[in-house]
């Protein structure tokens, strides 16, 4: 049995954020644990969910031991687990939302590296795992050991090209294509160019086997990046017409532009037919919506009709007798006044109070 090489690294781990959290509110925290090469454990601060995102921005530094085969020089896996948890009962208990396992051997000697990873579930049989994305920054520095070593193939889901955005972005959607706007002819040529767009993808979600092998064969990350970038630039897609294209058959953006410009223009009659068909579909759709609204209105009671019936049933004419039955002002001896009806003098006595009459 061959003796393995021993290495010691200083790891600077920064816990950035957790996005796409399926909670409107709540308090989340993380527990970090080094499963191989040490006994480091730590907990992050407890932060509140804001706009479906939790930001920690907390840095941790620790020492990590690694080993490598003396024959190949490839570092053995060193797993670092980040467990995301949610507070329950005011912090007295917690629930495990998911975890992310990071192989620190992939980041050895690569400088500052940003990694986004989907959370894995603890109980995938009974619960559905949410698509939360954990963002971390890892930097490793060799403290002791042979500086000549090889990193294992990366599990990142994109080819690390310098100047490109990081992998596993939130706004990234599957099957993104580079669209070239060439006028109205693109509207009628969409049905004919579906296989072309399926074969032409502007971004590779998974790294190819050759790019992974280039990482293994080189000691520096710069060499692997340059080799994978040159491989991507010189790759050509020979079977564009087939719809069963995988990640390996990727067409360059420049090839796609040249291919679309070189396509013959369709006849003007075809353009007019497609335009007239699209215009003729709109009134039909609008009529169907109006008929549906009419059916809904027929089942409802019209409030205006009810108000009109109530107003018609009321009698708003003036009653002449109501004018004569109001209060009257009476003046008594000594200038005393009182209010009452026209029967007041009869109760008080004749001549005691006289009614005040105002002539109009």
Curated annotation (Swiss-Prot):
Phosphoprotein in keyword set: yes
Hydrolase found in the keyword field: no
Record keywords: Phosphoprotein
Organism: Homo sapiens
Recorded family membership: Belongs to the EEIG family.
Intrachain disulfide bonds: none
Residue ranges occupied by any C2 NT-type domain in the UniProt entry: 1-142
Pfam families xref list: NT-C2
Gene name as annotated: EEIG2
In-chain residues carrying the UniProt-annotated modification Phosphoserine: 228, 276, 288, 320-321, 350
Descriptive protein name: EEIG family member 2
